């Protein structure tokens, strides 16, 4: 199931850097994290759903690249983001 518009707007409002911010790294990573967590729950129930597993791996790779970019450019924002999302780095 894809993320609902309401949930996505809620995440954007929480992690946006300014009014109307929809594309900052923080917002993208937060949305990807929600989607990854949702897909993880799906994969636990449907172990043989390989297409969803592949999509999950692509989202994890995209999030990893965005986090690496953020760490390279602004370490303080990176640390705040991983702390607020509860990621293990």
Curated annotation (Swiss-Prot):
It comes from the Bacteria. The keyword S-adenosyl-L-methionine does not apply. Transmembrane segments: none annotated. SUPFAM superfamilies: S15/NS1 RNA-binding domain. Part of the 30S ribosomal subunit. Forms a bridge to the 50S subunit in the 70S ribosome, contacting the 23S rRNA. One of the primary rRNA binding proteins, it binds directly to 16S rRNA where it helps nucleate assembly of the platform of the 30S subunit by binding and bridging several RNA helices of the 16S rRNA. Forms an intersubunit bridge (bridge B4) with the 23S rRNA of the 50S subunit in the ribosome. One of its GO terms (cellular component) is cytosolic small ribosomal subunit. InterPro entries: Ribosomal_uS15, Ribosomal_uS15_bac-type, uS15_NS1_RNA-bd_sf. GO terms for biological process: translation. Coiled coil: none annotated. GO terms for molecular function: rRNA binding; structural constituent of ribosome. The lineage of its organism: Bacteria, Bacillati, Bacillota, Bacilli, Lactobacillales. Keywords: Ribonucleoprotein, Ribosomal protein, RNA-binding, rRNA-binding. This is Small ribosomal subunit protein uS15. The keyword Ribosomal protein applies. SMART domains: Ribosomal_S15 (SM01387). Belongs to the universal ribosomal protein uS15 family.
